[in-house]
Design a protein with these regions (language model features):
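Cys/His-rich short segments
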Residues: 99-100, 105-165
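Short, basic, glycine/proline-bearing loop/turn elements
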Residues: 21-25, 158-159, 188
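Helix N-terminus capping/helix-initiation residues
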Residues: 1, 155-156, 251
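Short secondary-structure junctions
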Residues: 73-74, 122-126, 240-249
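Short C-terminal domain-edge/linker segments immediately following a structured domain
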Residues: 84-88, 133-139, 214-222
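Glycine-rich loops and low-complexity Gly/Arg-rich segments
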Residues: 79-80, 127-132, 209-212
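Active-site periphery "cap/insert" segments of enzyme catalytic domains
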Residues: 1-113, 117, 165-182, 193-205, ...
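SIR2/sirtuin-family catalytic core signature
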Residues: 49-51, 142-145, 160-161, 165-268
Length: 268
């Protein structure tokens, strides 16, 4: 039966996504020292509020680091660029108000739960809420209509379904941001062939913006990385974005330790 077969494929896909999410969740306990260091250094230099973070990752290291800034003496709020059901409930995630730091999760997030019934999105602050679907499904119900939610995770495959309204909203905000930006810094990103959506969005911005050309800087080295891997990666970036890409031999950790030193080398 075609219908049953199709449904089986859909269910299998959901299980694979949950399995991937569980694997990532188990890694969440790793140290996010350098995320905190980067945020602290940008804040110290008064650059944080002029910085927009775009993440292709599902983990919530950078999310939790930015969200942790919200306190009375430094009330910076995290803005994902989408509305959550939590906004309508007291003592829950608050609607961001200025001053804000924007974080766009273009492939979804471990702390997002989507309701296909009422088309709403719930955030589970500081927690990979997707795990509730495996560990305690009653805790994975929509805040608005009490139906069971599903993950928003776009798998790292060539075919990516970007039709979800919240995902498409995030992508629209990213493109708008890039059109107004002067510098795009890639950290820990290999410019994979599977990320064709990202490549062509950047190319579209690069070829149609009215401002001065967008500048690019890459930090994706690490101890023991092979020279041929570095060379192929640099060729991949420059083949698509042009020879003006500044491809450093530095790591994300080095950038996080002193971001201003690197940023100052760029004429903006």
């Amino acid at each position: 039966n075609l219908h049953k077969k199709s449904d089986s494929i859909r269910i299998l896909r959901q299980y694979l996504i949950l399995l991937m999410a569980k694997s990532l969740h188990n890694c969440e306990k790793t140290n996010n020292y350098y995320h905190k260091l980067l945020i602290d250094n940008l804040l110290k230099e008064d650059l944080l509020k002029d910085t927009t973070f775009i993440s292709a990752n599902y983990d919530i290291h950078i999310d939790n680091t930015i969200a942790g800034l919200y306190k009375k003496d430094n009330p910076i709020m995290l803005d994902y660029g989408v509305d959550f059901t939590n906004f309508d409930f007291r003592h829950s995630w608050k609607k961001p108000q200025s001053p804000i730091v924007k974080l766009y999760k273009i492939h979804g997030s471990l702390n997002w739960l989507y309701c296909p019934v009422c088309n709403s999105l719930t955030i589970t602050p500081y927690e990979g809420g997707i795990m509730r679907l495996l560990d305690n499904i009653d805790e994975a119900k929509c805040l608005a209509c009490d139906e069971i939610t599903i993950p928003i995770i776009i798998p790292p495959t060539y075919f990516k379904n970007m039709t979800n309204v919240f995902v498409s909203t995030v992508w629209r905000e990213v493109e708008k941001t890039l059109r107004e930006s002067d510098l795009l810094i890639f950290c820990g990103y290999s410019f994979s062939d599977a990320d064709i959506h990202i490549k062509y969005m950047i190319k579209r911005v690069q070829t149609s913006r009215k401002k001065a050309p967008l500048k690019f800087m890459v930090f994706n080295s690490y101890e023991g990385k092979r020279e041929d891997s570095k060379r192929k990666e640099e060729e991949r970036y420059k083949r698509f974005l042009g020879e003006g890409v500044i491809f450093t031999d530095n790591s994300f950790e080095e950038f996080a330790s002193d971001p201003v030193r690197f940023i100052k080398t760029i004429k903006i």
